[in-house]
């Protein structure tokens, strides 16, 4: 599109060539240029905020409006050729002031205001549009809605005329101003009508021309049809007026330039002097012509959007509502600023969100270092940047959008904050558990007593301090969600629960250690008691200290020993549990479990002693001690005249009485089972299912077990008793037969004639010995030695020593024989053949031994596993 006859509309390229003549805001086809914002950015107006001013110029076509602007503001609007009369400016053009300062020739030179934007509006009354006044009205409405100052360019000789003085255009301006004011009831926007009278000769004073124009303007205002409530309004309620005269540009060029320079000094910030008022009480303007009340309060970065919205309403013949447009602009710009702010916010926060999400996905939340400061800085910068850019817009919309932005930011920061607290919570619990466990193990390794409650209290304090430190570091000031007291309370509660669980675990380990001690003590003591059953001897065969205990009081001794051992264990448990800060209920549960577990240990030990092989062996030993030894504990040497049958019967019957005695756990004093149910006691009210799940049911104590106390105390059933009786009798019968044979063998082994034959054949030797003093003395010494050895019961040790010496001599002889054979080839061959046969025999025997040993090991492993599984 060719504009103004010689240059095209501005594109997207930001360069001086495209913007030499400014930017065409609206073309002659009433299309708005979307590149207005690019031009404002190019001219560095966008960051100015409210520090900019907008001036529009009105006037008839070909009256020198563009020439005036170019001279006054240094712009380069296209001007009409001197050789032809035609339309030059089409649509509405905009350019930034290029003349920053007035000429320096004056002493009171005044700097022009920054960022003055000048709009060159298409002239009125042109032949190109003819009677079509639609664009004239729309452009006037657009200029009035956006501009602070409206420059009316007229010639001096047109003052007093209606069309020539643009009174028709001004009537349009007044009408659209009333439309705007009718919509905007919250404020009273004012504008400045600045009449620049061209070709001013000075013949008619400027004041007279001013009065004429004001009279015409008041007449036009009074002729307007005003909305309800504004019938008595005055033109000065909405407009201020200023006047200036300029000489002819061609006939008085030097004076024209000088007056333009003077006029430019008025385009700066001014103020009203309350001490100087006119007849209507309006304060006079001092300084420049730009008053704050003229400004439309549209930030520079939103002007392009605002202007486009205004023009869209105008061109579509919709009622122009400036407050609504300002709110729409505020919403648009605040959303745009919010998006820009969130981009920078994302760059600062997204890495932390990614790290946190990755750690959570991996199942190992981590406390992120520097998160708190990063969140504070990101939030502060985001809100500050938003305030800087958006606070210039509509206050209500700005506050609403700021609240929305803060909600978006805070929702993400809150998620990070809670994730940080969750990670600190989890890591703190883990570190607390590990620290307490490590401290307990260290105390156990040192072998010294340690105070578990003190360890838990110390580590809990450190854990809470660390959590609070990490929580404070993640706090974002001035946010409600940064209060971490609820999370801290939950963390403290979890620490209490974990501490309680660790205390319960430690008490279980304590109970296990005490239980092992009980197992060891009971194992040794019960072994001694049951081993005493296998010894039926008295006298020299009795125990080393004291008399042989009564077999009838076996269970009394076992029960007393059991109760004393467990009482000692309870004392140890209670003393150690006091350092755990355990409650009375927890100690009661621990003692109750200890008693039940201890009974299980005793029951298992008794069952082990009552195994068929063990009990049968003890019965045989008891019988043999009573049968083979006399009341003094001396072994019996059976002779044919001994009453073996009666001795056998007494010993057998005495031993048989042990079977019913051992079959039931009964106290001799009461002839009743021990009070196990009262001794164990009722289940504590504080006991949990977890405390009971690993306990073995006890008859007479647990009602759900279905067994009575009598059944619980039955150690050998009736069937097993009968089997033991039968097998024991068979064993006793074998011992009796052996004794009987021994007695009979002593008679038949040496016939009587043997002694006569021995005397007859050995008479010479007897006489020789008796006559020879040396032989007689040797015989006497040997006889005395043999007698003494017999009296001291040393024949057995002497025989064993002799056998050991002979075995040692045999082994030494074999070794020397092997050394001799290894020295010759023949011997080596013989040894090789012998070793081959021995290897085969060894393999066969080894397989048998492995089977036998395997069975033993399996039994042993079973017993060991049972011991290891018996925990408290």
From Swiss-Prot:
* PROSITE patterns in UniProt: G_GB1_RHD3
Region called Disordered, residue ranges? 676-704, 849-872
Chain intervals with Acidic residues compositional bias:
690-704
Q: Which GO terms describe its biological process?
A: endoplasmic reticulum membrane fusion
Query: Looking at its record, which EC class is this enzyme?
Result: hydrolase
Gene3D superfamilies xrefs? P-loop containing nucleotide triphosphate hydrolases
The record gives the membrane topology as:
Multi-pass membrane protein
- Record Pfam families: RHD3_GTPase, Sey1_3HB
Q: Where in the cell is it found?
A: Endoplasmic reticulum membrane
Give residue spans on the Lumenal membrane side: 771-773
EC identifiers of the protein: 3.6.5.-
Q: Where does GTP bind?
A: 59-66
Q: Which residues cross the membrane?
A: 750-770, 774-794
| Cytoplasmic-facing ranges | 1-749, 795-872
Q: Which GO terms describe its molecular function?
A: GTP binding; GTPase activity
Q: Which family does it belong to?
A: Belongs to the TRAFAC class dynamin-like GTPase superfamily. GB1/RHD3 GTPase family. RHD3 subfamily.
Q: What does this protein do?
A: Cooperates with the reticulon proteins and tubule-shaping DP1 family proteins to generate and maintain the structure of the tubular endoplasmic reticulum network. Has GTPase activity, which is required for its function in ER organization.
Q: What is this protein called?
A: Protein SEY1
């Amino acid at each position: 599109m060719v504009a103004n006859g010689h240059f095209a509309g501005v594109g997207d390229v930001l360069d001086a060539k495209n913007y030499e003549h400014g930017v065409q805001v609206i073309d002659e086809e009433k299309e708005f240029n979307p590149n207005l914002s690019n031009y404002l950015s190019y001219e560095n107006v966008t960051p100015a905020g409210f520090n900019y001013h907008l001036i529009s110029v009105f006037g008839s076509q070909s009256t020198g409006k563009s020439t005036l602007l170019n001279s006054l503001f240094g712009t380069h609007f296209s001007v009409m050729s001197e050789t032809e009369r035609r339309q030059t400016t089409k649509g509405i053009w905009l350019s930034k002031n290029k003349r920053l300062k007035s000429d320096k020739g004056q002493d009171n030179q005044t700097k022009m205001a920054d960022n003055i934007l000048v709009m060159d509006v298409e002239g009125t009354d042109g032949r190109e549009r003819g009677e079509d006044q639609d664009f004239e009205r729309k452009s006037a409405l657009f200029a009035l809605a956006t501009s602070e100052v409206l420059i009316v360019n007229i010639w001096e000789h047109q003052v007093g005329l209606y069309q020539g003085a643009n009174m028709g255009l001004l009537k349009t301006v007044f009408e659209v101003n009333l439309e705007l004011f009718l919509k905007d009831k919250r404020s009273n926007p004012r504008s400045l009508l600045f009449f620049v009278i061209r070709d001013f000769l000075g013949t008619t004073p400027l004041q007279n021309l001013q009065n004429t124009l004001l009279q015409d303007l008041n007449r036009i205002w009074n002729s307007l049809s005003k909305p309800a409530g504004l019938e008595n309004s005055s033109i000065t309620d909405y407009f201020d007026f200023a006047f200036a005269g300029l000489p002819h540009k061609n006939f008085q060029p030097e004076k024209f330039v000088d007056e333009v320079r003077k006029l430019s000094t008025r385009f700066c910030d001014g103020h009203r002097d309350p001490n100087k008022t006119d007849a209507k009480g309006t304060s006079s303007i001092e300084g420049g012509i730009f008053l704050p009340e003229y400004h439309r309060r549209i930030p520079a970065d939103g002007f392009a959007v605002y202007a486009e919205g205004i023009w869209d309403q105008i061109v579509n013949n919709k009622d122009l509502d400036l407050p609504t447009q300002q709110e729409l602009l505020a919403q648009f710009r605040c959303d745009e600023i919010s998006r820009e702010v969130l981009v920078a916010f994302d760059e600062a926060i997204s890495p932390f969100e990614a790290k946190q999400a990755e750690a959570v996905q991996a199942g190992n939340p981590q406390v992120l270092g520097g998160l708190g400061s990063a969140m504070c800085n990101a939030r502060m910068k985001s809100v500050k940047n938003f305030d800087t850019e958006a606070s210039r817009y509509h206050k209500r919309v700005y506050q609403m959008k700021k609240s929305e932005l803060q909600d978006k930011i805070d929702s993400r920061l809150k998620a990070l904050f809670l994730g940080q607290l969750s990670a600190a919570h989890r890591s703190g619990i883990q570190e607390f558990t590990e620290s307490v466990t490590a401290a307990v193990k260290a105390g156990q390794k040192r072998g010294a007593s340690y105070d578990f409650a003190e360890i838990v209290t110390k580590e809990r304090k450190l854990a809470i301090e660390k959590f609070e430190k990490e929580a404070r570091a993640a706090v974002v000031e001035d946010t409600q969600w940064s209060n971490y007291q609820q999370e801290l309370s939950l963390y403290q509660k979890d620490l209490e629960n974990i501490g309680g669980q660790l205390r319960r675990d430690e008490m279980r380990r304590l109970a296990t250690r005490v239980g092992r001690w009980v197992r060891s003590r009971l194992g040794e003591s019960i072994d001694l008691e049951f081993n005493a059953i296998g010894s039926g001897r008295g006298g020299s065969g009795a125990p080393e200290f004291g008399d042989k205990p009564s077999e009838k009081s076996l269970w009394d001794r076992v029960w007393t020993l059991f109760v004393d051992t467990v009482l000692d264990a309870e004392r140890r448990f209670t003393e150690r549990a006091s350092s755990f800060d355990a409650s009375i209920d927890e100690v009661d549960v621990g003692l109750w479990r200890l008693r039940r577990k201890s009974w299980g240990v005793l029951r298992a030990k008794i069952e082990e002693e009552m195994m068929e092989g063990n009990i049968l062996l003890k019965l045989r030993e008891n019988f043999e001690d009573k049968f083979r030894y006399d009341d003094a504990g001396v072994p019996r040497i059976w002779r044919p005249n001994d009453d073996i049958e009666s001795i056998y019967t007494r010993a057998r019957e005495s031993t048989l009485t042990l079977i019913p005695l051992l079959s039931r756990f009964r106290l001799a004093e009461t002839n009743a089972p021990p009070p196990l149910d009262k001794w164990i006691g009722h289940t504590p009210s504080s006991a949990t299912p977890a405390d009971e799940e690993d306990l073995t049911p006890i008859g007479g104590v647990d009602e759900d077990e279905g067994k009575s106390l009598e059944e619980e105390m039955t150690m050998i059933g009736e069937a097993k008793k009968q089997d033991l009786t039968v097998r024991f009798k068979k064993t006793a019968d074998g011992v009796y037969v052996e004794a009987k044979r021994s007695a009979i063998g002593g008679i038949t082994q040496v016939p009587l004639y043997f002694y006569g034959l021995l005397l007859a054949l050995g008479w010479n030797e007897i006489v020789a010995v008796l006559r020879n003093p040396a032989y007689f003395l040797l015989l006497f010494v040997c006889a005395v030695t043999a007698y003494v050895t017999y009296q001291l019961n040393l024949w057995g040790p002497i025989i064993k020593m002799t056998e050991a010496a002979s075995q040692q001599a045999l082994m030494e002889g074999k070794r020397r024989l092997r050394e001799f054979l290894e020295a010759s080839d023949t011997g080596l061959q013989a040894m090789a053949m012998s070793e081959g046969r021995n290897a085969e025999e060894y393999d066969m025997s080894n397989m048998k031994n492995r089977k036998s040993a395997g069975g033993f090991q399996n039994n042993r492993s079973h017993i060991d596993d049972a011991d290891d599984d018996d925990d408290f």
